Amino acid sequence: MSIIKKIVFKRFNSTLKKTALHDLHVSLGGTMVPYAGYSMPVLYKGQTHIESHNWTRTNAGLFDVSHMLQSKLSGPHSVKFLQRVTPTDFNALPVGSGTLSVLLNPQGGVVDDTIITKENDDNEFYIVTNAGCAERDTEFFHDELQNGSTLDCQWKIIEGRSLLALQGPKAKDVLEPLLSKTAPGKDLKELFFGQRHEFALKDGSLVQIARGGYTGEDGFEISIANEKAVEFAEQLLANPVMKPIGLAARDSLRLEAGMCLYGHELDESITPVEAALNWVISKSRRDLVDQKYWFNGYAKIMDQLNNKTYSKVRVGFKYLKKGPAARNGVKIFLPDAETEVGLVTSGSASPTLNNINIGQAYVQKGYHKKGTKLLVQVRNKFYPIELAKMPLVPTHYYKQ
C-alpha cells in the first residue's frame, strides 16, 4: 500500500507559482499539489510512493527543487556578515566548498537551515534556503544588513535559474555523459560531497553542479538557466535508470537520512544545540572573548553547549511493533503511559527498513539517549518505540 495517503496537503490554489518544469511534470503524469507556494509533483503516474523511494535508493531519481530560494552574497564584508548570522566559520571554507549551516535570530533560534558555498576569493557566496521560508528569509537578510549598516556587502536573489537534484547510486552514470569532455572544468570523480563547481554541457551551456542532496545518497544539485531546464531534464530522463521522483518520496528519504524539515524539526524557537546540530557550530567560534565576534544568540547557544542547559533534544526513533505511523504533534510518554516527555515532529513508514515506522521527535533531556524505550500515543493507543541514532539508514556520500 502506498504511504502517500498519509500525507495531507492544503487545498490547491490557482495563484500558485510554477517552476520551469511544471508542464513536463504534468506530461509525465505528475500529481500536482501546492507546496511552499508552488505547484509541485507529489507522485508520478505508474509509481507508488514506496516504488519511487526504493528506486532512488537503488538507481537514480530526478527531483525538481527549483522552488528553493537561490541567492548570492557578495562584497568585502560578506564573511563578517555570515559570521554574525550563522555559527559557522566561513573564514576557513575553501573556494568551491559548501556547508550546511543555520541562520540565527538574536535569541539563537533557527530562522532557516541553509547550504552556503564559497564561490571564489572575492567574498562571493552562493546560498540555498527553503522555499517555504523565502519571504521571511528575504526580510531577515534585509534586516540584518541594515543592522550592520557599516558592513560593505550585498545580498540578492538569483532569478531565472532552475535547481534540479539527481539522487541515487547511479546519478553520476546518468549525468556524466551529458557533460562536455572538452570544456575546462573538474571531472565528476574529482567533485566530492559538499563541493560545487561550474561545468559545461555538450551544447556549451554552463551549469553549476554541487555534490550532495537531501536523501543520504550520492547525488548532485544542478543550477541551470530556466530556458535550458526542460531539455536537460528530458535528456536525464531518457536514461532508463533515471525516473522523476516527487515530494512524497523526498520526505521519506530525508527522514531515513535523519535530515531536518523546516517547520517540523526546526523553527525560530529551536536552537542548533536542541536540534542536535552541534557540528554546524565551528570549534573556532565557540570560545570567543571579544563580543564583536559573537554570532546571533551566542551566549544562549554556548551556555547550552557547555553547560547542557537545554531542556529537550531532537532524536530519531523506530517502532518496536506494528502500528500506525506517529505524525507531527503526536505525544511521547514514558513506559508508564502517564508521563509525557516529548513530541513527534515527523513520522512515516520506512521503505528501506521493511516499512517499519520511524520518525524524529523532541524529547526531554535525560530521556534522549539512544536505546531508550518510550511510548507514542496514536489514536488513543500506545505503541512502543526505541530511540535510535540518526541517520536511521546508512548514508552513501561521495567523500574524499
From Swiss-Prot:
Binding site for substrate: 221, 250, 397
Keywords: Aminotransferase, Mitochondrion, Transferase, Transit peptide
Compartments (UniProt record): Mitochondrion
Domain of life: Eukaryota
Catalysed conversion reaction: N(6)-[(R)-S(8)-aminomethyldihydrolipoyl]-L-lysyl-[protein] + (6S)-5,6,7,8-tetrahydrofolate = N(6)-[(R)-dihydrolipoyl]-L-lysyl-[protein] + (6R)-5,10-methylene-5,6,7,8-tetrahydrofolate + NH4(+)
Quaternary structure, from the entry: Component of the glycine decarboxylase complex (GDC), which is composed of four proteins: P, T, L and H.
Function of the molecule: The glycine cleavage system (glycine decarboxylase complex) catalyzes the degradation of glycine.
Name the record gives this protein: Aminomethyltransferase, mitochondrial
